[in-house]
Amino acid sequence: MIKMAESTLPLSQNPMRKVKLSKVTVNIGLGESGDRLQKAYQLLQELTGAKPVYTISKKTIREFGIRKGQEIGVKVTLRGAQAEEFLRKVLEAIGYRLKKSSFDDYGNVSFGIAEHVILPGARYDPEIGIFGMDIAITLERAGYRISRRRRKKAKIPKRHRVTKEEAMEFLRNNFNVQLVEG
C-alpha cells in the first residue's frame, strides 16, 4: 500500500482552491409574449453581444394570462472574458456596491437593475423602451466539472464548495466591490 504525501502548500496557494468566475446569467422576465418580448431579445443581444434564448412558462396562470409552454422572457449566459467584461460594466453602473444579502451560501450572487439605460454604452431607444434585468453571478473552483459530467458524476464535497465569505472576498479583490448591509 502506497501512502500519499501530505500537501505542503497552504490552502491559499493551492491552485485547486482558487475561486473563479464560472458564468454570468442575464435575465429579462416579462411575463408576456409578443412585440415587447422581441424588443427585449434585441436589447439583450445588443448589450451582451451573445445570442439570447427564450424562457418558457412552466405552468398556466390564468390571472396573469400565461399559458404553459408560452415564451415569457429572455436570458443569456456569458462565460469567460465576455462574462467578465459585462460584469465590469454592470458593476460600474451600480457604483461597485452590492448588498450582503445578495449572496447565497454557495458563492452565488444575484441582483437586479431597474433600467438598462444606466449601463455604460447603453442608450435609450424609444422604439425599444426601458427594461429591467436580473443578473446572476456563479462562482466555482477547479474540479466542479465532476458534478456536471455524464459519467461518474459526483457531488462537490462541502470543504470544496465556495462559501458566502469567499465569494465576497473574490468580488472585493477582483472587481473592487464594496459590500453594504441589507
Swiss-Prot record:
Cystine residue pairs: none
Q: Which Pfam families match?
A: Ribosomal_L5 (PF00281), Ribosomal_L5_C (PF00673)
Q: Which InterPro entries match?
A: Ribosomal_uL5, Ribosomal_uL5_arc, Ribosomal_uL5_C, Ribosomal_uL5_dom_sf, Ribosomal_uL5_N
Source superkingdom: Archaea
Does the record's keyword annotation contain RNA-binding?
yes
Q: Which UniProt keywords are listed? A: Ribonucleoprotein, Ribosomal protein, RNA-binding, rRNA-binding, tRNA-binding
Q: Name one GO biological process term.
A: translation
Q: Which Gene Ontology MF annotations are present?
A: RNA binding; rRNA binding; structural constituent of ribosome; tRNA binding
One term under GO cellular component? cytosolic large ribosomal subunit
Keyword Ribosomal protein applies: yes
Q: Which PANTHER family does the UniProt entry name for this protein?
A: 60S RIBOSOMAL PROTEIN L11-RELATED
Q: Which family does it belong to?
A: Belongs to the universal ribosomal protein uL5 family.
**Subunit details:** Part of the 50S ribosomal subunit; contacts the 5S rRNA and probably tRNA. Forms a bridge to the 30S subunit in the 70S ribosome.
| Function field | This is one of the proteins that bind and probably mediate the attachment of the 5S RNA into the large ribosomal subunit, where it forms part of the central protuberance. In the 70S ribosome it contacts protein S13 of the 30S subunit (bridge B1b), connecting the 2 subunits; this bridge is implicated in subunit movement. May contact the P site tRNA; the 5S rRNA and some of its associated proteins might help stabilize positioning of ribosome-bound tRNAs.
Protein name (Swiss-Prot/TrEMBL): Large ribosomal subunit protein uL5
Native source organism of the sequence: Saccharolobus solfataricus (strain ATCC 35092 / DSM 1617 / JCM 11322 / P2) (Sulfolobus solfataricus)
